[in-house]
């Protein structure tokens, strides 16, 4: 891992230099299962499943052994300039260090009310806590199925993960409004405002609340296809296959954002506002 380390005075133009000094440890188990539960003259069914359990931890970041040392690595769009995620020895990369949200007796979040962990009467950087949650999933898996009956064939593929946490940056940045959202004038208003009920300006620390740290475990059905093959359509035993397919069919997740699978981003901060497209297609294949 690359990390900035402090250098002796006069050894460089600055007091820090980017160095390949860090190290990381990965432990895990991979497995796969492929079964054919049905195999007859007309019917065929095969199912495949693969999974990976993984445990990733940083083991070294700099030359010192200070257990309190950590490197800030990821920020969010609002707030007071501090970063949200850190690299720290003993934790997964990009572990979140948020503030802990306070709630009322009905379970609703209280705006600008965060846990004062050090008891000094102020909310400062010292009140953040080590969540132990990161955007690196603890479990990956994939699923495929193939079914055929005479000239018909059907297939699907999907994948997902579990123990996967992301910070909903869009929700954090748009969690408050002094507009009456119940007036029916803004049907496309950000859903997060209805969820929080915040109406006052957010304090800087509110944007870093664990209210916006969500379990984004999901299952995505990547594609399905259904086809029919016309056989012996010519003197040369040709075939014609007509097929329908769909990609990005659906996603099952409790995540409140647009898509739990952040595109082009592995640091766990979701600021994507464009949905992933769903595609339908019809194909005709001729074989002679």
Regions found by a protein language model. Give the residues of each.
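Extracytoplasmic gating/loop element in the C-terminal half of outer-membrane beta-barrel translocons
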Residues: 108, 161-247
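Extracellular/periplasm-exposed beta-strand and loop segments of Gram-negative cell-envelope proteins
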Residues: 2-8, 15-24, 60-64, 86-87, ...
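Membrane-proximal, glycine/serine-rich, low-complexity loop/turn segments characteristic
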Residues: 63-73, 87-88, 92, 99-101, ...
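Membrane-embedded beta-barrel scaffold of Gram-negative outer-membrane proteins
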Residues: 1-13, 42-47, 52
């Amino acid at each position: 891992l690359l990390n900035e380390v402090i250098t002796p005075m006069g050894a460089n133009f600055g007091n820090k230099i980017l160095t390949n000094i860090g190290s990381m440890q990965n432990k895990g188990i991979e497995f796969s299962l492929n079964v054919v539960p049905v195999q007859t003259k007309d019917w065929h069914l095969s199912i495949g499943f693969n999974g990976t359990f993984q445990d990733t931890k940083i083991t070294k970041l700099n030359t010192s052994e200070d257990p309190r040392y950590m490197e800030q690595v990821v920020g969010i769009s609002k707030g007071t300039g501090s970063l949200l995620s850190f690299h720290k020895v003993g934790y997964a990369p990009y572990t979140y260090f948020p503030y802990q949200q306070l709630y009322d007796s009905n379970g609703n979040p209280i705006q600008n009310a965060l846990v004062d962990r050090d008891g000094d009467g102020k909310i400062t950087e010292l009140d953040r806590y080590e969540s132990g949650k990161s955007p690196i999933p603890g479990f990956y898996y994939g699923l495929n199925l193939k079914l055929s009956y005479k000239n018909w064939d059907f297939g699907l593929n999907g994948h997902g993960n579990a123990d996967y946490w992301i910070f909903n940056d869009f929700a954090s940045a748009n969690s408050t409004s002094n507009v009456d959202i119940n007036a029916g004038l803004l049907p496309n208003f950000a859903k997060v405002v209805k969820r929080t009920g915040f109406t006052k300006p957010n304090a800087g620390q509110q944007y870093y609340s664990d209210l916006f740290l969500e379990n984004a475990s999901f299952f995505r059905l990547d594609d399905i296809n259904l086809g029919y093959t016309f056989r012996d359509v010519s003197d040369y035993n040709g075939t014609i296959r007509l097929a329908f397919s769909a990609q990005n069919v659906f996603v099952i997740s409790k995540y409140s954002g647009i898509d739990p699978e952040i595109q082009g981003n592995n640091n766990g901060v979701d600021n994507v506002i464009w949905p992933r497209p769903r595609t339908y297609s019809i194909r005709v294949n001729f074989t002679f």
